[in-house]
């Protein structure tokens, strides 16, 4: 369950490492796997002082940016139709643009199969594994 102020890992190569949930899109209080949220980038990936100029040119987002995202993993248990229960070690998301296309070109780590039911096929095709 993702709600306001929840911190999530960003698992794509868009340049964000840690994001904070600012809003759940739609008339819902909590977001689960496959739901769209609005996030604020809290920490940038690879933004060290030595390579700041090189890394800032390669990143697509920077700290403080407000972006849309899709939740791909949650620590909250999710019950599936076949009776199995899945639970991940962290809360994670993938940044998307307003049209729903992923900002990054690669996804690191597993994503939940619930994305298939909610029609996020582009994210599923980029992910190395589904759980």
Curated annotation (Swiss-Prot):
InterPro entries xref list: Ribosomal_uL14, Ribosomal_uL14_bac-type, Ribosomal_uL14_CS, Ribosomal_uL14_sf
PROSITE patterns to which the protein is assigned, alphabetical: RIBOSOMAL_L14 (PS00049)
Compartment(s) where it occurs, according to its Swiss-Prot or TrEMBL record: Mitochondrion
Entries under CDD domains matching the protein: Ribosomal_uL14
A Pfam family of this chain: Ribosomal_L14
GO cellular component: mitochondrial large ribosomal subunit
GO molecular function: large ribosomal subunit rRNA binding; structural constituent of ribosome
SUPFAM superfamilies per record: Ribosomal protein L14
SMART domains on file: Ribosomal_L14
Alphabetical GO biological process terms: translation
Alphabetical keyword list: Mitochondrion, Ribonucleoprotein, Ribosomal protein
Gene3D superfamilies in the cross-refs: Ribosomal protein L14 (2.40.150.20)
Primary location group: mitochondrion
Record text on subunit structure and interactions: Component of the mitochondrial large ribosomal subunit (mt-LSU). Mature N.crassa 74S mitochondrial ribosomes consist of a small (37S) and a large (54S) subunit. The 37S small subunit contains a 16S ribosomal RNA (16S mt-rRNA) and 32 different proteins. The 54S large subunit contains a 23S rRNA (23S mt-rRNA) and 42 different proteins.
Functional summary from the UniProt entry: Component of the mitochondrial ribosome (mitoribosome), a dedicated translation machinery responsible for the synthesis of mitochondrial genome-encoded proteins, including at least some of the essential transmembrane subunits of the mitochondrial respiratory chain. The mitoribosomes are attached to the mitochondrial inner membrane and translation products are cotranslationally integrated into the membrane.
Family under the similarity heading: Belongs to the universal ribosomal protein uL14 family.
The protein's name in its UniProt record: Large ribosomal subunit protein uL14m
Gene behind this protein: mrpl38
């Amino acid at each position: 369950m993702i709600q306001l102020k929840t911190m999530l890992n960003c698992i794509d190569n868009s340049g964000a490492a840690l994001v904070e949930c600012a809003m759940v899109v739609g008339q819902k209080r909590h977001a689960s796997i496959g739901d769209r949220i609005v996030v604020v980038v809290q920490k940038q990936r690879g933004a060290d002082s030595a390579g700041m100029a090189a890394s800032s040119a390669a990143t697509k987002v920077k700290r403080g940016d407000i972006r849309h995202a899709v939740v791909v993993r949650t620590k909250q248990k999710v019950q599936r139709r076949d009776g199995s229960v899945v639970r991940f070690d962290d809360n994670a998301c993938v940044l998307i643009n307003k049209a729903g296309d992923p900002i990054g070109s690669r996804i690191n780590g597993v994503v939940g199969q619930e994305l298939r039911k909610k029609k996020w096929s582009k994210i599923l095709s980029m992910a190395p594994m589904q759980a």
